[in-house]
Amino acid sequence: MESFYHSVPVGPKPPEEVYVIVEIPRGSRVKYEIAKDFPGMLVDRVLYSSVVYPVDYGLIPRTLYYDGDPMDVMVLISQPTFPGAIMKVRPIGMMKMVDQGETDNKILAVFDKDPNVSYIKDLKDVNAHLLDEIANFFSTYKILEKKETKVLGWEGKEAALKEIEVSIKMYEEKYGKKN
């Protein structure tokens, strides 16, 4: 049986609508990662700092990014889901980030079937304080691991869509195109 990473499609209408496989629900300190070679989730670690993920966090299947991992996605949803949940989301922006010297940008997306966030159409519609919370989390969550991360700011929807297209192309170059 194949990993969800390879078996779940990118989405119904990429890059405007993509699937996300949730790895870490909002409010968790446990870092899960989807296994790439078999179906399942691996527990990577418990965060060293007393912080929790401020959003549901996961990946777009059948993507590959500069850091060698799938494209990361932060999902705006009013209730936490669970590791392994798959949802269709709409990208609205991107947080530019460097993790230990490697580009590790993260897509910000909205779960449209949640009336608490479905009105969000663009990065400018997101509460500025929430964007600050997200950036602060990713700036500090690895400090006690003695690892350096740096948030470089936010970019809009067009930049996010282009980055998703790049990550799809990188996946196809490595693994081949799948139906």
Curated annotation (Swiss-Prot):
InterPro entries in the cross-refs: Pyrophosphatase, Pyrophosphatase_sf
Keywords, sorted A to Z: Cytoplasm, Hydrolase, Magnesium, Metal-binding
GO biological-process terms attached to the record: phosphate-containing compound metabolic process
Residues annotated as binding Mg(2+) 1: 67, 72, 104
Cofactor(s) this protein cannot do without: Mg(2+)
A GO cellular-component term linked to this record: cytoplasm
KW Ribosomal protein (keyword) present: no
Function field: Catalyzes the hydrolysis of inorganic pyrophosphate (PPi) forming two phosphate ions.
Membership in a protein family: Belongs to the PPase family.
The protein's name in its UniProt record: Inorganic pyrophosphatase
Organism whose genome encodes this protein: Thermoplasma acidophilum (strain ATCC 25905 / DSM 1728 / JCM 9062 / NBRC 15155 / AMRC-C165)
Gene name per UniProt: ppa
